[in-house]
Amino acid sequence: MKQNKSLIDLIPNKIQVGGQDIDVSIVDSIEDGYCGISQLCGGYIKIADKANGYIQSDSSKLNTFIHECVHLIFRNIGRSDLSDDEALVVAFTGSATEIIRSILNQK
């Protein structure tokens, strides 16, 4: 099994969620040591290069990107309650990330 792209290359610079453009960027760090942050109305996802004093690995950055996408999807469908349920978002993200990486490893 092989991967043609590195994991960090899988993170796009821009996505759309519910027809809204979302800019994606990797920043040095985020307040409070978060790995990532997103804002649907603000149209952005920010992924920290360093979180809580540690450099995030590429796999962690990909997981953070998907995690923030899940938050945005829930907010977009009007379910902020689901977006605020961090345990649900983490569980969903873990499964989605594993599926994506499994698909990539088969190509």
Q: Model segments located where?
A:
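A short, highly charged nucleic-acid-interacting micro-segment common to nuclease
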Residues: 2-6, 83-86
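Catalytic zinc-binding patch centered on the HExxH motif and its immediate surroundings
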Residues: 3-16, 21-46, 55
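Short pre-active-site segment immediately N-terminal to the catalytic Zn-binding motif
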Residues: 43-64, 79-80
